[in-house]
Amino acid sequence: MPSFDVVSELDKHELTNAVDNAIKELDRRFDLKGKCSFEAKDKSVTLTAEADFMLEQMLDILRSNLVKRKVDSQCMEIKDAYPSGKVVKQEVNFREGIDKDLAKKIVGLIKERKLKVQAAIQGEQVRVTGKKRDDLQEAIALLRGESLGMPLQFTNFRD
């Protein structure tokens, strides 16, 4: 039976490249020079600036560099800014994997449309199986059309 997996993966190399490009762009910006910094740790980035409006500009720089490197900005989880001495800091975490709630929502969407496919939750991915390839492509089109708050990829398509 044909099947495919619905996953949400983050390319860590592209993420580090985007953060490095954002750091280079910060060095070139005259209004932010020497006052702001990005610190990357695994799947989180800490933004440090002197004022809140600078944090907003830094977030825009980070988003634009993520888009240039083809990393979906929907996986960003932006936390509230907090003061730390004379500077203001903000954490940005990058989510990866499909959590239980999103997996249930995906399965519910597929069942709600009464497509001729079955969806099963397998850890951090959802396996969709069906009798025909066309049914699977219909399910892919359905999931691409929905905005679920996380970027989805479709892998392991088997005939």
From Swiss-Prot:
CDD domains: YajQ_like. Belongs to the YajQ family. One of its GO terms (cellular component) is cytosol. Nucleotide-binding protein. It holds the Pfam family DUF520. Gene3D superfamilies: 3.30.70.860, YajQ-like, domain 2. Keywords: Nucleotide-binding. One of its GO terms (molecular function) is nucleotide binding. This is Nucleotide-binding protein PA14_57130. InterPro entries: DUF520 (IPR007551), UPF0234-like_C (IPR035571), UPF0234_N (IPR035570), YajQ-like_sf (IPR036183).
